[in-house]
Amino acid sequence: MSTEQTTKTPRVVIITGISGAGRRTAAHAVEDLGWYVVDNLPPAMLGALVDEIAANNIDRLAVVLDVRSRIMFDALGVAVNALDERGIDPAIVFLEASDETIVRRQESSRRPLPLQQGGHLLDAVALERRMLSDLRAEADLVIDTTSITARQLAQRIDHAFAEGIDEGLAFQVMSFGFKRGVPIDADLVFDVRFLPNPYWVPELRPKTGLSSDVASYVMAQAGATEFIDRVEQLLGGMAPGYLREGKKQVTVAVGCTGGKHRSTAISEELSTRLAARGHRTAVLHRDLGKE
């Protein structure tokens, strides 16, 4: 009788991005989901680590990589190609944030950026963006952490990985306020400012789109149901194409003026509709509570 033990092929996620964008916060979120997490691994060691993980029958591996030099970027490409040849398709998650956000976070931590070397902080940020532009273009998932909290980042990571990044197309529906800018990581953006604003209804003004009163008001407006019907059909029709192109997650942003009433209510309804179609969905209200 054979005593050979069957090993699992692990799912591999690579977490990288701009310094100060939240790589370690993302790693902690994944670790809380039961992933085996390794921080600051040189790219050249990725293959050996996967072998060790597989030998110990660990099926989910998340690796935080710091790729700021051409040599390390090339080494990552070699490592990823080697895994592809073995039937392991690692997912790359790239985190970024605005210059202002990174400066604020770095000043709060009182730690210089790795590329700063005594120079100006913004120059170091710009250099890092240029060095990582190719990697960002190849990422399976790009998350802009500028306007989201650590908790919201964890929720997005949870949505991407809790059910497995390779198990069909997932939709992230995000409400936002145009006055705070359009989410730069959105794949599709819809504007619901054509609907009457509950802000001008005194009894609804202090409430949010999560309130049944506000949601009922928004959905009762002319064009609201038709809008959601059409967006639902559009996304349902696009889903097979996204999957054929290898896209694992689509971020749909729905905006109103402040992100408190209309976009929140519409995002909740759209997320419910997509879930009823069998898609993995999550809803994030980026600007709720910031008014």
Curated annotation (Swiss-Prot):
Family per record: Belongs to the RapZ-like family.
Annotated function: Displays ATPase and GTPase activities.
Residues reported to bind ATP: 17-24
One GO molecular-function entry: ATP binding
Lineage: Bacteria, Bacillati, Actinomycetota, Actinomycetes, Propionibacteriales
InterPro entries in alphabetical order: P-loop_NTPase, RapZ-like, RapZ-like_N, RapZ_C
Pfam family, one: RapZ-like_N
Keyword GTP-binding: yes
Name used for this protein in its record: Nucleotide-binding protein PPA0813
SUPFAM superfamilies in the record: P-loop containing nucleoside triphosphate hydrolases
Binding site for GTP: 66-69
NCBIfam families, alphabetized: PRK05416.1 (NF003828)
Keyword set, alphabetical order: ATP-binding, GTP-binding, Nucleotide-binding
Protein source organism: Cutibacterium acnes (strain DSM 16379 / KPA171202)
